[in-house]
């Protein structure tokens, strides 16, 4: 290795540096809002520099932000929300003192850093609450108790990938661990404690085999012979093959008694006789069961991977997939349950760096220099990757790549003394190691303090997970590898449990934990499919879906939209004009046959345009169209865009120009759809076009006949909300929050959507309710909830008397944070519209990123599986594997297509509407049949699905960041294009100004443009 530092002797090899590491007006008869106090915003915590003496980052290098700490969730039971003191929420109006805010929740920045010693608060009864006793923390909120189990549906048995875990009868002790000098690597920490146990288990540890979390906590099944003890532990560096003496490192380890983990409380909680889950006891058991897998495999999160747990499959561009398993212990109705699932992720192939680069670029680089774009791509892919040198025989020193040189190797020199003498890298390697560098036109890798390593002397170290964004081909390859038939997945899970041999796990034995090797048998019910209403002019006026599916044959959309003027632009070079004309003609005929008032011909002939001229072509053609329509005082209703199959950023550019600049909705079609052009493709396109121009495809028969409990009896608005985060490695991109809400009642089928940008990886939706100071109007209230409530009133003529809020994307550890902040925002938004206006709220979290899978009890029984071998749509489980006391359920609302279906998990965090289990399960399942884009039931409730689509669409509205090292991040509360035009800016944690999203045109805002 060549160094740029002036020095008297060359440190050609050195140890690895080690760091891993506006409201827009009021609806009629809404009262004037009361002035609201201006909320103060608190800045986010300061950024942290990695520990240890690390070199300054090379030019353009990004600083990695520290993740926010998230408080551990504690399970609770229900609090009465108004005058009731029973376990479920009261149906009477909210107490007056709580109308302004049911909870004074902290701002997101305050929630991100919980107090280390929170005050001990008693649960609050809202009936006796005064303004001085408004709940302010998770300790004062109780989630609703389960209101009994559901009874509707056909009963059946299913199997779940949960394995009963016997609760140990042990006296668990918790000890604090301090290791000096402090290191950030869990691997090093574990090595230190492992050596300590090897040396002192029989003596100082009293024969105990402790379980260690790799950080600050150590647990034992019984007390150690001391309350505090100091140890000196020496570790030797790995043998690098040089034959030289291995470096020693000495650590001071202090172990102090901290507390006892109360397993009795856990037992009471599992039996439903204790309200709060003892999180520490659960954490201990989880750590114990992770000890052995952490030593055997590569741990990431709650999963463990190995190249020997299945076939390694190439993913392309230097990546490969490793198989593994997910493991988590959970409290359930059947007791403790170990959830085991198959898993796979991408690893970097252990290739010579020069071969990795050739795969990454899909090009032979052995005889040519790199372009600037290629160099940037390589730099992003290799930064942080660990390599070992190969030019010194058996000596394999390891380094972590920090960057890439701009100059090729042949131009690189470095000072060798303080007199200014310089030497080239090529000369240095020849003289020092007798190694002739062959590829001198390639850049060098930079490691440590900008020392140089030629690519050809480096090989990537095995076992490094790839945490950056995968491209579409890699995602497809990974999905193909992980996609398993339900029967095969069940078989592999059972094999993995037997392979892990928990009965022989020394840590499980030490702590008395016994794991069953049989999947849990669970009672389930198959909910009936709802009857769907279509237009009276069709041959079939309604239909009953079969196995989650139906079609549009002999049916007309219940409310067909109008498209009087439309045009088509073709960006696909291989699609001839005659083909485009034929496709447009057939699509228009299908839209007419489906019930739409659709003009048979476009107002202008289809235009062929270059894919690199999207904005220019669209705006020019729109101008031509308006020259025709303007004198007639008409507007353009629709754009049909034909795109290449691999269209890169073309799709996003088209959507941005249409929705932000021109104010028209669009329907994109890929080349393969145009050439194939069968009735199914055309019918699906017609479904999407209809809702984009304001129509309805279908509604529930029970909705129009007003037979849906707690929905059709009084005006009800259903919300869906989601936050999408940028991909790993995109440290400067904001998170996008989206909220949609039904705009028709009792049909609950049309949804308007709002979006906003907010702080990077911020999960709380910061723009639900906002107030700001206007120079003319004074204090102004706004936010997404308020605007959607006003929009509902304008559309239906009714004020919502009931709110059902489906919230997607929330992990279990964030339940309290999200409920405290977002329910408070809903309350304030309602109060800002009218004094004493507080509709009853039910707040439900929707989860798909879990690892519970349900399998048919008998895979050979054709009456219990669909065509893909999965459980039937409508299968619901609210027993055994669900929460011991709280209101949750698993629902597989869709028919499988490929692989193993993943049921959605619904967890009720707040319920003032007093839903029964049957009422909420039936409502949720039935709504899944109203998704606008297809004639199938979908896997999650449509409002949550629409929120995800809206958030995904909004990412196209942001200006692309093409810099190599952008540092701009978004901050809290940026008004989005759908929620007004406030241009106020706040500050992000790093002090950078927040960049609002561009404003969406009102003509687009009113319809389901995101479908």
Curated annotation (Swiss-Prot):
SMART domains for this protein: DUF1785, PAZ, Piwi
Residue spans of biased composition, Low complexity class: 28-53, 61-92, 963-982
Keyword Kinase: no
UniProt region (Disordered), positions on chain: 1-95, 107-147, 963-994
Pfam families found in the cross-reference section: ArgoL1, ArgoL2, ArgoMid, ArgoN, PAZ, Piwi
CDD domains, A to Z: PAZ_argonaute_like (cd02846), Piwi_ago-like (cd04657)
GO BP terms in the entry: regulatory ncRNA-mediated gene silencing
Piwi domain residues: 638-959
Annotated keywords: RNA-mediated gene silencing
Extent of Basic residues compositional bias: 1-11
GO cellular component terms, semicolon-separated: cytoplasm; nucleus
Compositionally skewed regions (Polar residues) per UniProt: 127-140
Domain of life assignment: Eukaryota
Location of the PAZ domain: 352-462
GO molecular function: RNA binding; RNA endonuclease activity
Protein family membership: Belongs to the argonaute family. Ago subfamily.
Function: Probably involved in the RNA silencing pathway. May bind to short RNAs such as microRNAs (miRNAs) or short interfering RNAs (siRNAs), and represses the translation of mRNAs which are complementary to them.
Record-given protein name: Protein argonaute 1C
């Amino acid at each position: 290795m060549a160094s740029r530092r002036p020095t008297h002797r060359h440190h050609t090899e050195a140890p690895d540096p080690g760091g891993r590491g506006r409201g827009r007006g009021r609806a009629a008869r809404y009262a004037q809002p009361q002035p609201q106090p201006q909320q103060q915003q608190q800045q986010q915590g300061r950024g942290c520099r990695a520990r240890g003496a690390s070199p300054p980052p090379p030019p353009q290098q990004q600083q990695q932000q520290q993740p926010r700490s998230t408080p551990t969730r504690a399970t609770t039971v229900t609090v009465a929300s108004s005058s009731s003191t029973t376990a479920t929420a009261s149906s009477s109006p909210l107490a007056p003192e709580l109308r302004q805010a049911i909870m004074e929740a902290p701002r997101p920045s305050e929630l991100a850093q919980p107090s280390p010693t929170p005050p001990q608060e008693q649960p609050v009864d809202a009936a006796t609450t005064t303004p001085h006793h408004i709940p302010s923390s998770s300790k004062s909120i109780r989630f609703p108790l389960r209101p009994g189990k559901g009874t509707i549906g056909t009963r059946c048995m299913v199997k779940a990938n949960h394995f009963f875990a016997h609760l140990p009868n042990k006296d668990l002790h918790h000890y604090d661990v301090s290791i000096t000098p402090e290191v950030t690597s869990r691997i090093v920490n574990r090595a230190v404690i492992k050596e300590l146990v090897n040396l002192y288990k029989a003596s100082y540890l009293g024969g105990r085999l402790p379980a260690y979390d790799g950080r600050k906590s150590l647990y034992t099944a019984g007390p150690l012979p001391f309350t505090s003890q100091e140890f000196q532990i020496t570790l030797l560096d790995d043998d690098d093959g040089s034959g030289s003496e291995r470096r020693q490192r000495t650590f001071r380890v202090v172990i102090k008694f901290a507390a006892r983990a109360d397993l009795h409380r856990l037992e009471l909680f599992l039996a439903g006789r204790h309200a709060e889950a003892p999180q520490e006891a659960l954490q201990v058991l989880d750590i114990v069961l992770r000890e052995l897998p952490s030593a055997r495999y590569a741990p990431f999160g709650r999963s463990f991977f190995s190249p020997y747990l299945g076939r390694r499959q190439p993913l392309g561009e230097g990546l490969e997939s490793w198989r593994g398993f997910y493991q988590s212990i959970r409290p359930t109705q059947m007791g403790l349950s170990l959830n085991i699932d198959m898993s796979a992720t991408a690893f970097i192939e252990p290739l010579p760096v020069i071969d990795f680069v050739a795969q990454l670029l899909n090009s032979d680089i052995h005889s040519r220099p790199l372009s600037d774009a290629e160099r940037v791509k390589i730099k992003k892919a290799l930064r942080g990757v660990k390599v070992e040198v190969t030019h010194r025989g058996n000596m394999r020193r390891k380094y972590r790549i920090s960057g890439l040189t701009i100059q090729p190797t042949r131009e690189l020199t470095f000072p060798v003394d303080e007199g200014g003498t310089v030497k080239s890298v090529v000369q240095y390697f020849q003289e020092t190691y007798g190694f002739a560098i062959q590829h001198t036109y390639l850049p060098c890798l930079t490691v440590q303090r900008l020392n140089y390593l030629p690519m050809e002397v480096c090989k990537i170290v095995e076992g490094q997970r790839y945490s950056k964004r995968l491209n579409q081909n890699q995602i497809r390859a990974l999905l193909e590898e992980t996609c398993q038939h339900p029967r095969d997945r069940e078989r592999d899970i059972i094999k993995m449990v037997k392979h892990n041999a928990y009965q022989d796990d020394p840590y499980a034995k030490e702590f008395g934990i016994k794991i069953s090797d049989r999947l849990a048998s669970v009672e389930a019910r198959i909910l009936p499919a709802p009857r769907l209403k279509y237009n009276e002019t069709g041959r079939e006026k309604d239909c009953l879906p079969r196995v989650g599916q139906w079609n549009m044959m002999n049916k007309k959309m219940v409310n067909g939209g109008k498209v009087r003027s439309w045009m088509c632009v073709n960006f696909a070079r291989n699609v001839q004009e005659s083909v485009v004309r034929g496709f447009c003609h057939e699509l228009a005929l299908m839209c007419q046959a489906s019930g739409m008032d659709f003009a048979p011909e476009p107002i202008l002939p289809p235009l062929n345009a270059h894919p690199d001229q999207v904005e220019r072509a669209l705006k020019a053609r729109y101008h031509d169209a308006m020259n025709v329509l303007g004198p007639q005082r008409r507007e353009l209703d629709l754009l049909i865009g034909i795109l290449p199959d691999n269209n890169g950023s073309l799709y996003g550019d088209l959507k941005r120009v249409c929705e932000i600049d021109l104010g028209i909705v669009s329907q994109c079609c890929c080349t393969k759809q145009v050439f194939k052009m069968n009735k199914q493709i055309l019918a699906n396109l017609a479904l999407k076009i209809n809702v984009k121009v304001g129509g309805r495809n279908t509604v529930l028969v029970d909705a129009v006949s007003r037979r849906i409990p707690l929905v059709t009896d009084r005006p009800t608005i259903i919300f869906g909300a989601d936050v999408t985060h940028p991909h790993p490695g995109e440290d400067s991109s904001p998170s996008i929050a989206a909220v949609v809400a039904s705009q028709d009642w009792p049909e609950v089928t049309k949804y308007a959507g709002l979006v906003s940008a907010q702080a990077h990886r911020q999960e709380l939706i910061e723009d639900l309710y906002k107030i700001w100071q206007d120079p003319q109007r004074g204090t102004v209230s706004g936010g997404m909830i308020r605007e959607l409530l006003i929009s509902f009133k304008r559309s239906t003529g009714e004020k919502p008397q009931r709110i059902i809020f489906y919230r997607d994307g929330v992990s279990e550890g964030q339940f309290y944070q999200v409920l405290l902040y977002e329910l408070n925002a809903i309350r304030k938004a309602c109060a800002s519209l009218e004094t004493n206006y507080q509709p009853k709220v039910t707040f439900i979290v929707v989860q798909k990123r879990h690892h519970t899978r349900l399998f048919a009890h008998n895979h050979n029984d054709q009456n219990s599986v669909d065509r893909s071998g999965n459980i039937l749509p409508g299968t619901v489980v609210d027993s055994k594997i669900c929460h011991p006391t709280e209101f949750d359920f698993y629902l597989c609302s869709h028919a499988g297509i490929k692989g193993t279906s993943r049921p959605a998990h619904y967890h009720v965090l707040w319920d003032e509407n007093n839903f029964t289990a049957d009422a909420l399960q039936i409502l949720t399942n039935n709504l899944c049949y109203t998704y606008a884009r297809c004639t199938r039931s979908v896997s999650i409730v449509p409002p949550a699905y629409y929120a995800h689509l809206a958030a995904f669409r909004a990412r196209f509205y942001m200006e692309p960041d093409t810099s190599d090292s952008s540092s701009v991040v978004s901050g809290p509360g940026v008004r989005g294009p759908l929620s007004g035009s406030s241009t106020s800016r706040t500050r992000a944690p790093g002090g950078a100004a927040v960049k609002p999203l561009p404003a969406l045109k009102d003509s687009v805002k009113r319809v389901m443009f995101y479908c």
